[in-house]
Amino acid sequence: MNKLYELKVAKITHLTTSSVMITFEVPDLLRKVFSFEAGEYLTLQQTINGEKVRRAYSICSGVNEGELSVAVKRVPNGVFSSYATQELKEGDTIEVMPPMGSFVFFYDIFGNRDIMLFSAGSGVTPMMSIAKTALAMTQIKVVFVYGNKSKEETLFFDEIEALKAQYPERFKVHYAFSQEPWGDHYTGRINDKIVNDLFDKYKDFNWGRYYACGPTQLVKDLREMLLLRGIDKDRIFTELFEASPAEADYSQLQGNVEITLRLGGQTHTFESAKNQTLLSSALMRGYDAPYSCLNGVCSSCVAKVEEGEAKMAKNETLSEKEVADGYILSCQAYATTDKIKIKFEN
């Protein structure tokens, strides 16, 4: 269930001085495996300096384009991002998991209504996939709000401008530059004043869904702004592009727990310390449990508690209903009972 496929890097495109777009060559036999919904992400794995490093990156290509690409922005002390932006070459291979994620563009009743996309920094990556797909495959309007420090640090700037020229009536772009004003676009970070102005400007649009992706605080603030406007929470989709601090500390738990793990059609039972996350307990024993970011952001490690109880150090991915139904982020979950049974699902 946690299968990795070796894909060749077909093309590397430099987006800014610190970011690249990686386009993979997908063999015909794997086309179906790597078909994706706009907004999904890929988990990449590479051996760097003798260690296997795994990271999640959102797909930035549109469903309509027939390509599979992700964008990577170098971050301070980022092992994988430094490798991808400075060492990776065309023709190299990377191990890649099939697309996954719940931050996607839906083709249902709300999929026929206009959408508003909020992003900041590298949070624009899934928005590019959603915007390109919506513009090419539907007739809805897309309001695209993108915050960054300056025009020079804006990922996909030329492509965004080209889409704006291609769809002048349906693609409305608004930048918010915090450090360098540009044209008649907003100055400063995305805030309630900007959000209110956009709703006034596009009051005649037939709104369906709202998407927000970027730093934790911005995404939380945007969600609250939208809820205060009376927008149903089921029409607001969010994804975080940075890990937030833990909300609770369970690393001081005492004693051991008997863990029964259902994974890939097999059942394993073993004992572990309660002060280790359920995911780390499984990985330390060589079980191929699914994971990617290890920070409670990507949701690759979701499992369901079938018996016993667990508490999460933080959760900004699962809904209240999912938690009530027994789902956990295993990289953040600690057993609080002496026995626990969990199942990793596809």
Identify the role of each PLM range.
Residues 146, 176, 264-268, 273, ...:
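Short histidine
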Residues 32, 207-210, 268:
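Short active-site oxyanion
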Residues 255-290, 294:
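C-terminal accessory/binding modules appended to enzymatic or scaffolding proteins
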